[in-house]
A protein has these predicted regions:
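Non-catalytic, polymerase-adjacent accessory regions of viral genome-replication enzymes
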Residues: 1-209
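Core nucleotidyl-transferase/polymerase catalytic module
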Residues: 1-53, 64, 79, 197-462
């Protein structure tokens, strides 16, 4: 009886999490006093508005200056202190978060066929195939069991919706239960892959908006980064695939700049380069995450999922114990289908991510890469790989095979001198993929010291 009551209460929590109650219009009047509050502009063209919920608080950061750093600078370098004294890492308020969300409010390319130029499509397809080869794992890892994936979550971090204000450590059993319930949504569609799974009708928990600041010298114009705080139940489902995938890439030395100190990695990578023949390129895409088109996200998900076995160790042991060969084969096919259905669900959520803003309003994006997913880094990396190869194919660039390295929106590659042009690359990306190349941050250079990769500058080639 006690277990039934607990299950009923847990079910009500899940229902409450996905059926958000309407509330009164938030009070947007500017408060009296000296502080000026900028009212957010909530009108969007492509981002879909959802039913509003309730307000919640967002941590905005600590003081503008660290007291110990301030004391040390005043004592030993007063001129430097006076130069940076007006700076801050504090993010902005709700209006700044809406400005960040607005970056996702743009036209999308849903499939490759929507690009009219056949030659451009062929170059994009070649770039995707190159990425598929580069990210292919010879030894594919097995996916995790549900309990193993829950154990991958960081217990001292926020649990997200619906456990607002709680750490994951306090609600681990509930997270596992909700993840299992979402996982069970796909099971009725695993027998026959011809049957369409209505994933858009599934009631899935929402992301919450968090914020992260960037250093700026003018505290009246703070730099703000919108953080998509994924619900723990979705993270637990993602971890079944993403966690073993990252570990496999570190071990098998694939094109991700992972597993070693970035400074050592890049120096070793550049050690055998003939500087008289090969130049270095590093591209920087403005608003990288928000400008990614959904057809590239789908291709990146396909590549990622194809590099993880559809079975956990636990599932394989279960199949091996089945009585007849026919039973084992049937369950084998069912598990493969479930792997594909889980990909459909997580891919849909990744592209069409719902987010609740601190003022209670909620929205659903239709393109771009959300920052809080387990898949964010690998999806960004695959797409970045495609961007660079695409620009090289469009120019007929001669590039060094197996030398392109990426991590998220950072990249470094070798090209033959005189065969690559940044202006042409910017034009091709803007015209055909609707993304903007930052000339200020992109580099075409002869020496490693002229590049900045993963935040490192290599003075004197080191």
């Amino acid at each position: 009886m006690h277990q039934n009551q607990f299950a009923a209460r847990l079910h009500r929590k899940v229902v409450e999490a996905v059926q958000l109650p309407p509330v009164h219009e938030p009070d947007l009047a500017e408060p009296t006093g000296t502080t000026e509050v900028k009212i957010p502009n909530r009108s969007f063209t492509h981002v879909k508005s959802l039913k509003p919920s309730f307000k919640y608080g967002v941590r905005r950061g600590g003081p503008d200056q660290d007291q110990y750093v301030r004391f040390a600078l005043k004592q030993y370098n007063l001129s430097l202190y006076e130069e940076i004294a007006g700076g801050t890492r504090k993010p902005g308020g709700d209006a700044a978060l809406y400005d960040e969300l607005r970056n996702f409010d743009g036209p999308d390319i849903k499939k490759l066929e929507d690009i009219p130029n056949q030659e451009v499509r062929s170059h994009i397809l070649r770039a995707i195939r190159d990425a598929e080869k580069a990210f292919h794992l010879e030894q594919k890892p097995k996916r995790l069991s549900m309990q193993e994936s829950v154990d991958e979550l960081k217990p001292n971090t926020a649990a997200g919706w619906p456990w607002i204000g709680k750490k994951k450590a306090l609600v681990m059993p509930e997270i596992a239960q909700m993840a299992e319930e979402i996982h069970n949504l796909v099971k009725p569609y695993c027998t026959d892959m011809e049957v369409r799974m209505p994933v858009e009708e599934f009631r899935l928990p929402w992301c919450m908006a968090a914020t992260r600041g960037g250093m700026t010298k003018d505290k009246t114009r703070p730099k703000t980064r919108l953080v998509w705080m994924f619900p723990s139940a979705i993270l637990a489902l993602e971890a079944r695939i993403a966690s073993p995938l990252y570990k496999a890439y570190v071990k098998q030395c694939k094109p991700l700049l992972l597993g070693r100190s970035p400074s050592v990695y890049v120096q070793d990578w550049d050690a055998d380069r003939d500087t008289t023949q090969w130049e270095l390129i590093g591209l920087d895409i403005s608003h990288f995450d928000s400008e990614v088109k959904s057809f590239l996200v789908k291709e990146a998900f396909r590549i990622a999922f194809n590099n993880v076995h559809a079975f956990s160790t636990e599932t394989l042991e279960k199949i091996q114990k089945m009585g007849t060969v026919e039973e084992r084969n049937d369950h084998f096919r069912w598990e493969v289908n479930k792997h594909k259905r889980i990909r459909q669900l997580l891919q849909y959520y990744f592209i069409n991510t719902p987010i609740m803003m601190p003022d209670g309003y909620a929205f659903r994006k239709k393109r771009g890469v959300p920052s809080g997913s387990f898949f964010t880094q690998v999806i960004d990396s695959i797409i970045n790989y495609v961007y660079i190869r695409f620009t090289e194919y469009m120019q007929g660039t001669i590039f060094a095979h197996d030398k392109l390295r990426v991590l998220g929106d950072d990249s470094i590659d070798r090209v033959l001198r005189g065969t690559y042009d940044l202006e042409k690359a910017a034009s091709d990306l803007e015209q055909h993929l609707k993304v903007t190349l930052s000339f200020k941050k992109s580099i075409l250079a002869s020496e490693l010291k002229d590049l900045k990769v993963l935040g490192f500058e290599y003075e004197g080639g080191r």
